[in-house]
Amino acid sequence: TYGDMNMHLGFITSIAKQKTFPPEYSILPGTKLAYPFLSDSISSSVYIWGTSLRTAYLLPMFFALIQVFSGVYLLAKKIMQYFGGSIRGKSFLAIALFFFNGGLGFYYFMNKGLFSENFTRIFTAFYETPTNYVQANIQWHNIFCDMLIPKRATLFGWAMLFPILI
């Protein structure tokens, strides 16, 4: 899931050193970067300001996550206003259902209790979660864990999408 982080770190340092727009692909000089580079250009600006590469990578993602969460909340609030009723509670429910979605795979982990070895595997086993349990052929990917955190282009695309929809 996080295999492209090295690529993004390379893009960030390359864009910071090139100081050209549109940026070029650092491995193939003279070739324009065809990958969505909004997030990496923002991170390269933060990197030029003198922050560490780690901070330059994480800080824009943090603000984009806040913008996406706020955008989903405000969009849900606007939709709930249209239908009437308790706006605030329904908007928070919409956020919970949208971002922390999943299936009923938790049954496989909780069928022997909260303190069983089955349940603790969620926290100790490599990528063994109630929504991604290969042994039972459960592959229900979570939007937050499988799309927004590891895929920077999706995160920044959604950060721009929700203000447009509102």
Regions found by a protein language model. Name each.
Residues 1-160:
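Active-site lumenal/periplasmic loops and adjacent helix-entry segments of GT-C-fold
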